[in-house]
Amino acid sequence: MVPNEVLEKYGSDAVRYWAASARLGADTAYDEGQMKIGRRLAIKLLNASKFVLNLGATEKSVITSQAQGHVLINALDRSLLARLAYLIEEATAAFEKYEYARALQICESFFWSFTDDFVELIKDRAYGARGEQEQASVLAALATTLDALLRLFAPFLPFVTEEIWSWWRAGSVHRAEWPQALPILEGTLLAEYSAQNPTAGISAQWVLADADPAQIESLKQILPDVAEALGGLRKAKSDAKVKQRTEVESATIAAPQA
């Protein structure tokens, strides 16, 4: 029996999303509401990818070595990729335990934060308004994140990820290597690991470049803190019943001392 009507209504990726949302060993009810969420996710992934690639992110922008990590001169970009490195570790661990529903949940949560917060914060830099170095930094962050997200989402949304992959990468996303976040190593250990695994992927250590690994947790927190401030500004505009694009003359942000 083939559910043609459901597939035509929501798409194959959306139906697969619903199936993947079920916990291993648990009974799962037929739920078109979950399919609607899956369809929305697939469409958003498609549109967000178009936007990122139209900004100028290319395959060459993807960070695959420690040396390339030095292009990341903006703390917000470094924060995003530090969080990405930990997402890869967490999603991989979930898959290894056959907890694919959890892997989907954490990837989806990261993706919505990426599109709703990070992408909204970097548009001026992406268009070159703050100079070439800032533009190169943000394009590297965008390309590296998109590259990893397509690989992570491929088991759940195989058709839309394959379509997006074909826009800027050769071959098939389903034959591409699984993204890997390197262990946080220091000095010669990191150099040795990098030499043996030249295409292993982005790591939190690479994002920090020459910084102390102890700073990683603080670095990870930058993006959510900025996103929280952005959310406060959005709420203030909504409460004032003005358009979101209305300029803010001034804002006071209270935060604990670093």
Where would I find each of the regions flagged by the language model?
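Catalytic adenosine-cofactor/nucleotide-binding cores of aminoacyl-tRNA synthetases and other
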Residues: 1-65, 173, 239-245
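Conserved structural-core and active-site-/substrate-pathway-adjacent residues in large, well-folded domains
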Residues: 11, 45, 114-115, 158, ...
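Generic alpha-helical secondary structure signal
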Residues: 13-17, 79-86, 109, 113
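Membrane-interfacial loop-to-helix junctions in multi-pass inner-membrane proteins
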Residues: 30-37, 99, 134-142
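Glycine-rich, acidic and aromatic/proline-enriched surface loops and short helix-turn segments
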Residues: 51, 112-120
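Acidic, turn-prone loop/beta-hairpin segments
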Residues: 59-66, 70-89, 120-232, 240, ...
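Short helix-adjacent coil turns
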Residues: 95-102
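Aromatic-lined ligand-binding clefts that engage carbohydrates, nucleic acids, or primary amines
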Residues: 104, 108
